[in-house]
Amino acid sequence: ISLEAALGGEGAQAALPDRLEIPGIDVDIPVVELGWHAATTNDGAIFSEWDVAEYAAGWHKNSALPGQPGNIVLSGHNNILGAVFRELDQLRAGDEAILWTGDDRHAYRVDQVLIVPEKNATAEQRAANAQWIEQFDDDRLTLVSCWPRNNNTHRIIVVARPVDSTDTAHAAGQ
């Protein structure tokens, strides 16, 4: 089955994101596809751990594609390997984020900026944190990074909502 057919039937327009712009914090970065790998805790338990992009934002391959329903998840470093999400904590509700798939522009407005504990957090807290990168019934773009810059004890989660369907128009036609 083709990706197009799986995501919405024949004629559906779905493509991998390839660039993210956030004008308010001077971000204009490539987006690459990310997967995950098996990792082991100190006590020998095996778990899945997301890969993280270097010098780019990473699109989580089990998340939605731009123009399709669901949660589009991008992650990136805040203090190493390009520090592409270094300034996420400067975003405020109403700030714009633009996700590109080739020449197609998908505009979003920041709705929430959350900072949640991660290091030494309870299993329940970490499970609650992980819910932000799962699928939702509504359309959203979720950006995730470590926080703060000096010790990464928390996660910063930015949720942005589509501006409207006219802002996902082909850039050449605007």
Segments the model singles out, each with a brief description of its role:
Residues 1-174:
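Solvent-exposed, non-transmembrane regions of membrane-associated and secreted proteins
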